[in-house]
Amino acid sequence: MSAVPWIIKYRPKRVEDVIDQEKAKEVLIPWIKKWLSGTPPEKRAALLWGPPGVGKTSLVEAICNEFNLEKIEMNASDFRRKGDIERVAIAAATKKPLPPWKGRLILLDEVDGLSPRGDEGAVAAILELIKKTKNPIVMTANDPWGTHLRPIREESLLVEFKRIPKTKAREFLLKICEKEGVYCEKEAVDYIIEKNKGDLRASINDLQSIAEAYGKVTLDLASALLVERDRVLTPWEMLQSLFYSKYSWQARKAVTSTDLDYDTLFLWIAENVPKQYGDDPYDLWRGMEAVSRADVIYGRIRRTMNWSLLPYFFNALGPGVALAKTKYHKRARWSYPEKIVLLARTKEERRVRDELASHLALLTHSSKSYVRREIIPMLQFIAQVNPNYFARLALGLRLSDPMIKYLAKSKYQLVKKYVEELKSSRTVKAEEQTKAKEVVKELKKEYEKGTKKGKGEKRRKGSDEGSGLLKWLKKD
């Protein structure tokens, strides 16, 4: 057997060697070819996302080999700060490679490893990199749906990678054993694949570890040696595992194997229990009773900060919900929690509200909470009952157009019209005042000129009249 790790030895050298992922290839290869033709695509970066061990990085490396591209790779640990990206990635992305390379590809691996708070400036630097690049940028992520990664998603071509089918993974592992001259049972390979949840990279590592230690791979050896790896479940996988759990330990593992925070986990389950159990009133009642119990426990934890109650929260949400059913129900159409969807829709409106509260708090020397509670509702009421007066207030308070729109709601167009009229009338008044000042200046010049000459009583009299007019204009 080879001393080289099998994941390196049997890594795909060509695009066609990458197992499955045909849809991903159909999207990514034409995108790369556009770069090589000298006409960069509209999306200057590609974001490859999917479960671990399905071939995201392998496909990128195969593309580099096949198209003779120089690969500049950075891991999440290499671009924690803005300076890290500016020092390496931006410099590489804006320059051409030396021969014999035909081009250069920038690979940012595991961008979902960036912390929304800890990695200051990294996301902004990646966006700057995408804007400036003269070479294709490819990023990989297991879960790209974090809110801090939204700007990157919007600027990238999203390429999804599916889990590798069990039959194709089995065929590949058996082929490795054949090339290495290792006896291998099909049942053992199936067991390894199931333990690793379709992660081909982890399956190859386990296969090699057993083969090197015992010279063969059997089901008895695999079941005795391999420990199931903990894997983070997506919300959809968590629901699938929860609603179809047979035992309480399976249900508890489902709700504790996701990286959702406690509030969001509760919302996901509370939203989808009625959808899953809705065809049976008794199961629905028992399921929602478990959800209600979890809500009470979590409320008690929040009030008293007694986190020793957390296991009871998980027991209510996990086994409590899963074992509420008296039969297995057909899979329902699960959905995102309505509260999360609503918050996403109103994100911009809440941002304007917070800016308005900060602006008015500064003007009125009040707290933001007082402004939100007392002043904003009053302004909204004025906008509805007296749009003309509200327009004057808006100008006086120097409110921006989004703030006016937030306060005026349905009367926005009418208020906007009044604001424009007030602005134009103020402009006219300002012009009239400017003209009056110019007249005053001219009269003052005439007066000074007449005083200097001092010829005759008539001129003095005229000067006095001019002075009187000057005083009257100033008074006006």
UniProtKB/Swiss-Prot annotation:
Q: Give the keywords, sorted.
A: ATP-binding, DNA replication, Nucleotide-binding
An example of a Pfam family matching this protein is AAA
| GO molecular function terms attached to this record | ATP binding; ATP hydrolysis activity; DNA clamp loader activity
Q: Which domain of life is it from?
A: Archaea
Which GO BP terms, alphabetically? DNA replication
Q: Name one GO cellular component term.
A: DNA replication factor C complex
SUPFAM superfamilies per UniProt = P-loop containing nucleoside triphosphate hydrolases (SSF52540)
Q: Where does ATP bind?
A: G50, P51, P52, G53, V54, G55, K56, T57
Chain spans, region Disordered: 447-476
Here the segments flagged for biased composition (Basic residues) are 452-461
Task: Please give the function described in this protein's UniProt entry.
Answer: Part of the RFC clamp loader complex which loads the PCNA sliding clamp onto DNA.
Subunit architecture: Heteromultimer composed of small subunits (RfcS) and large subunits (RfcL).
What HAMAP family has UniProt attached to this entry? RfcL
> According to its UniProt record, which protein family does this protein belong to?
Belongs to the activator 1 small subunits family. RfcL subfamily.
Name of the protein this chain belongs to: Replication factor C large subunit
